[in-house]
Amino acid sequence: LLFTVCLHHFLGCDLDRVYEELGTRFPEIVFVRCFMDPIMQKHGLTPDQKLRKAMYDPLITKEPDPLTVTLVGSDFVLDESSDIKRLLRSTGHTLRELPACKTWAEYQQLGSAGVFVSCYPPAKYGADMLAERLNRTHLYLPGCFDYEEIKEEIRSLIKELQAGWSREDTSNTECADITSEEIEAFYQREVTLCEDSINHAKSIIGDTPVVLDYLYHPRPLGLAKLLLEHGFHVTTVYLDSISPEEKPAFDWLKLHHPDLELRATIQT
């Protein structure tokens, strides 16, 4: 992984020529073009978006496996209790993740997925480009705090898995047989468990003031809305911008909790 910095841009370095020469001299090494150019954050793609795309550029085209799903652009392996992991496990699918890869061969298997999924906003661009390059489907299922949005994401994932099953005529009856009633039952169970956990947390935290930072989650306003709806004493949210994905939460907070402070991170 080679990181170029602001100085390379100031000096007008011919980076294409540099990488070409490196590839010629060391053909056995794959050089990934990474970026550390904060001066360019305000225009176009951010360094984070470009890096998350670059991490998957070495993947080569493979025969798609309809029973494999690759999670793109995440920093950590999904927890075993995550919705996506449990759903895929129940339908006989294999989930592949970059942080779980230990060898180059395992890394290359990421490209064998029939479906790519991304959950982190800065990963969406790279996942779109990867899916287009390898001629696959990409589902953007962002982490969120609204039950109905989560429900629709679950439906979208299962619908795409069933479509892949149908196209390839596989024998994956577990996925094909999932009904709307079963999805609804799964959803209701998850909501109940979530509500129980939130209420348990509230019984411990009580009226202690809560301050949120956008570095914890890309949807801090959605989290603030969830907590306030459940009686938590959220006082401040630190963030430098408001994502379009957060507009419904922002509008709700403005109407129901106009006293909530939104502060720029420079004010910490």
Language-model segments: residues:
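An N-terminal assembly and electron-transfer interface module characteristic of large anaerobic redox
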Residues: 1-268
